[in-house]
Amino acid sequence: PVREGQFEFFRRVFTSVVQRRHQEYEEEITKMIERYTNPEMGHLWSIENEWQQILNVEMAACDAMAELGEIPKEAAKNIRAKAKFDVKRIHEIEMVTHHDIIAFLTNVAENVGEDSKYVHKGLTSSDVKDTAYCMMMRDAAEIILDDLRKFREVLRRRAVEFKHTPCIGRTHGIHAEPMTFGLKMLLWSAEIERDIERVEHAKEIVSVCKLSGAVGTYSNIDPKIEQMVGKTLGLKPVRLATQVIQRDRHAEFVTTMAIVSSTLEKIATEVRNLQRTDIREAEEYFSPGQKGSSAMPHKRNPINCERISGMARLNRGNAVAAMEDITLWHERDISHSSVERVILPDTTINLDYCTKKLTNIIDKLLVYPEKMLHDMGRTGGL
């Protein structure tokens, strides 16, 4: 028999573990560490917003069903008025069900009451989760497009500033022919312009919805519901689907982000090379009080550009993972889910951070025209 003191001890231990896990779950904002997370993008990928987007899909489906007479209109109104969720409560239920969407629906039902029987009618989990993730990818792309457009303008402004600043062009790392520093920056601007077009296309590719039920046959839901929900949420219904939206879309999205990250790394690497002591034709802004080394106080290191180079490697790795997700068993499996929970937030948070960071670097970039002229003379004017 369990002694009286032992029971109380075990009860306290269990309660402490559950409370700690609840706290960790509530505090979990994104997979990317806070150091590289900007607030707007971080909120977009928060647990709270993910469930809110899923709820938006469910409510839009109920509204559409009510409009078509498939559920009572009063029920749809009641669902929209009362439907809410609690992140802690969802996690508490999930610890029993081991199914996040069922946990979510159970929590919503606790708030809605009798009319909750109409929520999720004819749908499968992937209908709401895939559609919600597509909205989040679309919104993330909008943030990144805004970042890139601002970066493009900074590059154009500085390209004009240095349009008459001669410097030596280098091929194979060796002096080649004279050019202008403005031309170098204009080249970067042109590549960012292409990246903007790529992201716009990637945004369109993932701006889709799927509400066709298990294995995508519409066996328990009218195809009109999908059309109506898509219109409400600003998404296009996919032409064909299995139980999931096909992952070539997600792969193209993540791969596009990796290409843009590589463009940023290309620019950052050039700044790093130009900042080398041997060249020092340009360098990152060094703020008052900034230090370069704990052992060598003379150091002025291109740490921000180095950070961008490192983070580009992460996104290229994420692109490989996204392509691995294209292959699923038969009409679906769930092997993609654990990958996407990490790479979709990480990739977009990473790119948002790096684009903003590099925009600031180029905006404040210190350029030394006299050193450029000096270096041109090292080859005797050839």
Where are these regions (language model features)?
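Glycine-rich cofactor/substrate-binding loops
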Residues: 28-53, 93-97, 114, 296-382
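A helix-coil-helix interface module used to build multimeric assemblies
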Residues: 26-212, 218, 222-228, 232, ...
